[in-house]
Swiss-Prot record:
Location, primary (coarse class): membrane
Entry keywords, A to Z: 4Fe-4S, Cell inner membrane, Cell membrane, Iron, Iron-sulfur, Membrane, Metal-binding, NAD, Quinone, Translocase, Transport
Protein purpose: NDH-1 shuttles electrons from NADH, via FMN and iron-sulfur (Fe-S) centers, to quinones in the respiratory chain. The immediate electron acceptor for the enzyme in this species is believed to be a menaquinone. Couples the redox reaction to proton translocation (for every two electrons transferred, four hydrogen ions are translocated across the cytoplasmic membrane), and thus conserves the redox energy in a proton gradient.
Origin species: Bacteroides fragilis (strain ATCC 25285 / DSM 2151 / CCUG 4856 / JCM 11019 / LMG 10263 / NCTC 9343 / Onslow / VPI 2553 / EN-2)
Family: Belongs to the complex I 20 kDa subunit family.
Enzyme class: translocase
Its EC number(s): 7.1.1.-
InterPro entries for this protein: NADH_UbQ_OxRdtase-like_20kDa, NADH_UQ_OxRdtase_20Kd_su
Listed name of the protein: NADH-quinone oxidoreductase subunit B
Length: 196
């Protein structure tokens, strides 16, 4: 009976692993050597994982938050889409769902929560109040849309939107995450260099 040899695994020293510079250097070398296929497949794999495990942070101030709670019930089963891990801490969340009216006094709090989230981070504006100010848009104390404070990725209209509309908006965000470039290329927050 032949004993299998233990495979030799090349490891990266911890000092090189702490930051992504060594990984980015390896990707740059692969790109220069003509291995774009490998990087493209790696992009697809990472984006598949990220898109199917988006953890929401809910910032609910009105009736849209109640509709979001219906998503967690057995009838709609949020877990099958990868959104079941709702977080109370912005440091653990991938996206923030702004549900309801945002007042001028609440705007700095929302901005602070967004700033505490790790990159890449996404914003979904849910309901007429978050999208455009809703019926309170002419009031002196209401922000007319979350996009005045944060960069919004997906808008879910409705007053309040049905749970199916929530899912449609979340699936739109999943599609958006799947086509982002993780290695190389231009992401949504970056700009293409001029002249290229």
């Amino acid at each position: 009976m032949e004993i299998m040899k233990k495979p030799k695994i090349k490891s990266i020293p911890y000092e090189d692993f702490i930051d992504n510079e060594s990984l980015e250097k390896m990707v740059k070398e692969l790109n220069e050597g003509g291995a774009n296929v490998f990087v493209g497949v790696l992009d697809d794999l990472i984006n598949w994982g990220r898109s199917n495990s988006l953890w929401p942070l809910t910032f609910a101030t009105s009736c849209c938050g109640i509709e979001f709670m219906a998503l967690g019930a057995a009838r709609y089963d949020m877990a099958r889409f990868g959104f079941e891990v709702a977080r109370a801490s912005p440091r653990q969340a991938d996206m923030i769902m702004v549900c309801g009216t945002i007042t001028n006094k609440m705007a700095p709090v929302l901005k602070r929560l967004y700033d505490q989230m790790a990159d890449p981070k996404y914003v979904i504006a849910v309901g007429g109040c978050a999208v455009s100010g809703g019926p309170f848009r002419k009031s002196y104390h209401v922000v007319n849309g979350v996009d005045k404070i944060l960069p919004v990725d997906v808008y879910i209209p409705g007053c309040p939107p049905r749970p199916e509309a929530f899912y449609y908006g979340m699936m739109q965000l999943q599609r958006k995450v799947k086509i982002e470039k993780f290695f190389g290329g231009v992401n949504r927050k970056e700009k293409k260099p001029e002249g290229k």
